[in-house]
Amino acid sequence: MSKTLLSRIKPLSNPHASNSFRSHLPITPRIKKLVSDTVSILKTQQNWSQILDDCFADEEVRFVDISPFVFDRIQDVEIGVKLFDWLSSEKKDEFFSNGFACSSFLKLLARYRIFNEIEDVLGNLRNENVKLTHEALSHVLHAYAESGSLSKAVEIYDYVVELYDSVPDVIACNSLLSLLVKSRRLGDARKVYDEMCDRGDSVDNYSTCILVKGMCNEGKVEVGRKLIEGRWGKGCIPNIVFYNTIIGGYCKLGDIENAYLVFKELKLKGFMPTLETFGTMINGFCKEGDFVASDRLLSEVKERGLRVSVWFLNNIIDAKYRHGYKVDPAESIGWIIANDCKPDVATYNILINRLCKEGKKEVAVGFLDEASKKGLIPNNLSYAPLIQAYCKSKEYDIASKLLLQMAERGCKPDIVTYGILIHGLVVSGHMDDAVNMKVKLIDRGVSPDAAIYNMLMSGLCKTGRFLPAKLLFSEMLDRNILPDAYVYATLIDGFIRSGDFDEARKVFSLSVEKGVKVDVVHHNAMIKGFCRSGMLDEALACMNRMNEEHLVPDKFTYSTIIDGYVKQQDMATAIKIFRYMEKNKCKPNVVTYTSLINGFCCQGDFKMAEETFKEMQLRDLVPNVVTYTTLIRSLAKESSTLEKAVYYWELMMTNKCVPNEVTFNCLLQGFVKKTSGKVLAEPDGSNHGQSSLFSEFFHRMKSDGWSDHAAAYNSALVCLCVHGMVKTACMFQDKMVKKGFSPDPVSFAAILHGFCVVGNSKQWRNMDFCNLGEKGLEVAVRYSQVLEQHLPQPVICEASTILHAMVEKADTKEPVESP
């Protein structure tokens, strides 16, 4: 309803005299009987309009004159609407000249919250220039405020103030104050409160308390106290309700010291603390971890003859958990009973939640069953931690059964509970089960939200199932569930990953069209798509649009564009973007530098590649497996740079960077291709100032007649094992065996020592070297002596003991014991 509409409705001359119409119509016994008979006729007679005309034909009083009393007595709003329509059409002139009758009808509509009808009636009254009472408009304001219609409530309030130069009645104003505070519009609430104080006696204690509570909830406790002093005087707090509000405000701020001062003050002034007072203080001390103080207050509650609330005890148990105290669940239940309280659902929820966090799922289930046996009805907070715990341990069958059990026990799973299970299924890759769970959710009357759709679409996109993801997006729109920014970003990225950039562009355009706040993530996804499609000009244009929209390009933005130019072999532009990135104070990351290193390597400019590698280290950036693999792959392609490839292989071991299969194969391929001549220089200590373990082993094996490939393979394993990466060494060996490469004595020696390095020597029994024989073991011992020059004495002793025991037992079938 617009202010223009309201401005056409005129007030009665005396707004505060809400019953002034009765002055010209005394409520005589005859009037009372007419009103009662009319209400009865309206309720019981089909042809009530004709009957009323007949009844009032011979009466001195017109029906319109008693209609305000009739509307006040009617309890059925439908009858009231019919009566209003009849009066508006059949007795229009008489009816609309009586503002009291229209006002009473408006009060009836407000009482039953018939807002559409209220709007229509106010529209009609505007056209008829009808006078309305202050009381009726106060009722309308109260109805709007209690229903949460803030804009309408404020509109009515402003109209009343403008029209009557007074605020609506105190009940209506208090409802508006409550709504403003709830909506966190404290400034507007304070304005209304001040007008209530300035314009007559339209403020009561509840009005002040509403605003003070709002101030305290927002952390403005001192402002709240000044508000109290402004009304009752300095240092004066009128009653226990205000004390409780102030104490609650301090506790919420974590200012337990001031809260306790106010608590002592109220007792000194003769006020009796209530259970709420004690509960707030106990909770405050619990949050601080001061359980001595909370126990002292608990004793005071008992001394004063107040009944201890289980809420107090629950807070103490929960706080002890949060502060790291060891709490026995069974003892906690006994403690509550000893305090003449019964454990409630909240008690069990606290215990179940904590047990699940401690990994004691089965014990938690026992407490859930115990709660049910005691007649308590578990809720979503009872089941959600259990479902989450079982999902975390990948026991999805049990999690699903718990969901069914919830329904059987009369607890309807909410969107959060379903979301936990769906998230667990998605993370574990059980996408079909996750989608089916969404279907069950809908079948049980729970509507999925944007977060659940986002989870499902993200999981589908990651597993390459883009069509189902697109169908889910369409379903979302069909169900009028507005996709949020994350949903759009997930779908855009999914289509780009699948190579369907056209579809990604459509989704991006749709997000803009729907008014979604497109952020850096969305633009980065599009930039990735442009770069993958070789559309680098469009990628730059997208980054420029980000600047125009006041979005700051991040490391991903620049790194993606740099990588795009590197792949186009346009290093000049890639470096230009890199410098622009630095100029805009966006620090390059490992991905950025790795892209540049790759670009230089592709051009054969290994000098610049190595300088870039050094620069990233000087900036405290740690090269990752992709960085090292990029260098090793390129350097291993040429005989002249193969030695440097070995250097970076050993450097990544030294820096605790675990190589992957690609790194391993790239290095070996360098040796496979070099079938003649020296592939590595003799170790002379000039390799960047370090001796090369790889080179030492490689040349030793070559001199013993091993092939380049076998020597390189074993040398790589030796490096891994010496640096404690025996698990990776075993994985590479398994893959080589599957390719037909048989294990040899040197591999055995390397991996045996590797297990000893990590303190797991017993694992050598699982190694597949059963056919080494006596000669093979002798070879293993010989190479172990070389290997032991690079290992600490305890490792040497342990490995040597195992090897010599194996040699001694070589001619028997007696098993060798681990030392």
Swiss-Prot record:
Alphabetical list of InterPro entries matching this protein: Pentatricopeptide_rpt (IPR002885), TPR-like_helical_dom_sf (IPR011990)
PPR repeat spans: 98-132, 133-163, 169-203, 204-238, 239-273, 274-308, 309-343, 344-378, 379-413, 414-448, 449-483, 484-518, 519-553, 554-588, 589-623, 624-659, 709-743, 744-779
SUPFAM superfamilies documented for this protein: HCP-like
GO MF annotation terms: sequence-specific mRNA binding
Keyword terms, alphabetized: Repeat
Keyword Heme: no
Recorded superkingdom: Eukaryota
GO biological process: mitochondrial respiratory chain complex I assembly; mitochondrial RNA processing; RNA splicing
Record-linked PROSITE patterns: PPR
Gene Ontology cellular component terms for the protein in this record: mitochondrion
Signal peptide feature range: none
PANTHER family given in the database record: ATPASE EXPRESSION PROTEIN 3, OS10G0484300 PROTEIN
Record family assignment: Belongs to the PPR family. P subfamily.
Protein name in the entry: Pentatricopeptide repeat-containing protein At1g52620
Lineage of producing organism: Eukaryota, Viridiplantae, Streptophyta, Embryophyta, Tracheophyta
